[in-house]
């Protein structure tokens, strides 16, 4: 005979953590999760700050530029601009010594840029944690979150680590389309970025991933099992079928004939499709960290010396070096007004059209 002592309840008493856990992760249709406590507020503030800045806030006091819809910019030319170089690496808190609680002054000083950059970084981290949390909840492997580390690495290296290595937030990209293009030209002129091997690996990763994606999608479409009499993909197979929807064997034979080699199992194929772009993004991020420290790569000095001595000797490299000098000369004076740079007209390189 068994005697049970104690109070019997249908459900064990829940402590505060369990109540919160249920509220965040189970009692709703759209998953929030503990990661959502970081993701949603930070994403809201980052996007809200960007929309506010591009709509109303000028860059006259930091860059001498118009940068808002209010001043006549459009979607491509509006931006949330970086603070002035004189503010160095200040966090530019609204209540800090620079703005002293004055919201208008805070916007004029570029406070919205640090606001958007830092909240944006934590929002991206929150999104990666969301993928970890949801994967763990449904017992998936965490490769989605691992893959998303690539974009996070690029964002953090470009918007945070690079300016931290330079003299201030001023040299980070402003948050806008044309502003990012200007930053790319700046990277080329001042760092010769396109000849950096880490940039090359990044390009290979991103373009290689696009190629793999196109090949994979086309191959699956080409080798679908036909389950109906429909004329196109969306009618010729049943979306709820339990069986495999395409023939890996047929795909393998096809690419073996095309290239001579082909993936023989899906796990290796899909891991490769994960590995290529993520590795490319991480390599780019490492390269930008190097630029933050002003490391140089691939300076072919022997060609530069020979080109200087022999007017008839020229390579694509020496032409690009001259182009970079032109970018620096034209950009520096207008891009860094705080330096008060003045170049004599005769030293500014000009094309035939000018």
Curated annotation (Swiss-Prot):
Sorted alphabetically, the Gene Ontology cellular component annotations on this record are: chloroplast thylakoid membrane; photosystem II
UniProt catalytic activity: 2 a plastoquinone + 4 hnu + 2 H2O = 2 a plastoquinol + O2
Enumerate the GO terms in the molecular function aspect. Answer: chlorophyll binding; electron transporter, transferring electrons within the cyclic electron transport pathway of photosynthesis activity; iron ion binding; oxygen evolving activity
Cofactor detail note:
The D1/D2 heterodimer binds P680, chlorophylls that are the primary electron donor of PSII, and subsequent electron acceptors. It shares a non-heme iron and each subunit binds pheophytin, quinone, additional chlorophylls, carotenoids and lipids. There is also a Cl(-1) ion associated with D1 and D2, which is required for oxygen evolution. The PSII complex binds additional chlorophylls, carotenoids and specific lipids.
Query: Which EC number applies?
Result: 1.10.3.9
Q: Where does pheophytin a bind?
A: 131, 144
Q: Any idea what this protein is called?
A: Photosystem II D2 protein
Organism, by scientific name, is: Piper cenocladum
